[in-house]
């Protein structure tokens, strides 16, 4: 039986790009990947945060400015990474934006400009990241491409329409890439989180604990609150060799929320 590497060796020798890596899920993942031995390239448009994180992590990390909606930026990101480290093993397409505070909005009140903006970043950025990572990984005959999607791809009514459309597209893209890239030993997977508070949520620090408590109360897994580290740990597993035969999945990290419809049970209990 093949031995499993120790907890700090799971990505030893690997090179990872994390888009949206300067804050939130991306920053947490960058730290965890670094702790587990990877050379980490933090890609973002938040230059001060990204550079500060790279400096904190030290010599095996660097920051590259990248607007994922611009193909030239993504080409530069991948080419600079390969020039610096000689390879690319993990492409985590995590960068994303939301409408307002991410709450559902009537389609009548939705703006086409919001749809264009979210599709350009959330779906277009994922497409470009996968495209240019594949250029390198095909030559290596191995690699891992990850995407951050959303629980709104599994349950309707949790977000604005533009966001749901963009993230559903990400899941479709990942699924469609799986058979093509599998021929080259490249694994492709999505991660779809339940609600959590990150920088893109536009929620003030004063309201952060209140919103986290509400999400925890509404969740199915009692006593637990999903935070960025929960998604980072899912990404670590999928990026590691432990997941060598895992490809084409949408890993839903929601504490079981999406498999439960409490309305019938609530109606029954209310009558008892």
Swiss-Prot record:
Leader peptide range in chain numbering: none
Active site location: 163 (proton acceptor)
Domain of life of the source: Eukaryota
EC number: 1.1.1.-
Database matches in InterPro entries: NAD(P)-bd_dom_sf, SDR_fam
One term of GO molecular function: oxidoreductase activity
A Pfam entry, by short name: adh_short_C2
Residue numbers binding NAD(+): 17-41
Residues given in the record as substrate binding sites: 150
UniProt entry keywords in alphabetical sequence: Oxidoreductase
EC top class, as a word: oxidoreductase
Family statement: Belongs to the short-chain dehydrogenases/reductases (SDR) family.
General function of this protein: Has no tropinone reductase activity.
Stated name of the protein: Tropinone reductase-like 1
Organism: Erythroxylum coca (Coca plant)
């Amino acid at each position: 039986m093949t031995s499993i590497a120790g907890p700090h060796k799971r990505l030893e020798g690997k090179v990872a790009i994390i888009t949206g890596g300067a804050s939130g899920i991306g920053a947490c993942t960058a730290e965890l990947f670094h702790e587990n031995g990877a050379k980490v390239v933090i890609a973002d448009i938040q230059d001060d945060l990204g550079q500060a994180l790279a400096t904190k992590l030290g010599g095996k990390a660097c920051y590259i400015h990248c607007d994922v909606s611009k193909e030239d930026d993504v080409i530069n990101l991948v080419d600079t990474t390969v020039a610096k480290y000689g390879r690319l093993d993990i492409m985590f397409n995590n960068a994303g934006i939301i409408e307002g505070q991410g709450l559902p909005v009537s389609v009548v009140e939705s703006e086409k400009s919001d749809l264009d903006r979210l599709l350009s970043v959330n779906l277009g950025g994922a497409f470009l990241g996968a495209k240019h990572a594949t250029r390198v990984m095909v030559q290596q005959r191995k690699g891992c491409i990850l995407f951050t999607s959303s629980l709104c791809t599994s349950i309707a009514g949790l977000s604005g329409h533009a966001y749901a459309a963009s993230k559903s597209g990400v899941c479709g893209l990942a699924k469609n890439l799986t058979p093509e890239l599998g021929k080259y030993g490249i694994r492709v997977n999505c991660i779809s989180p339940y609600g959590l508070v990150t920088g893109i949520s536009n929620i003030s620090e004063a309201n952060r604990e209140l919103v986290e408590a509400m999400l925890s109360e509404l969740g199915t897994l009692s006593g637990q609150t999903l935070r960025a580290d929960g998604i980072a740990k899912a990404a670590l597993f999928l990026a590691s060799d432990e997941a060598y035969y895992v490809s084409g999945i949408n890993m839903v990290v929601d504490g079981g929320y999406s498999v439960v419809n409490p309305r019938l049970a609530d109606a029954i209990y209310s009558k008892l």
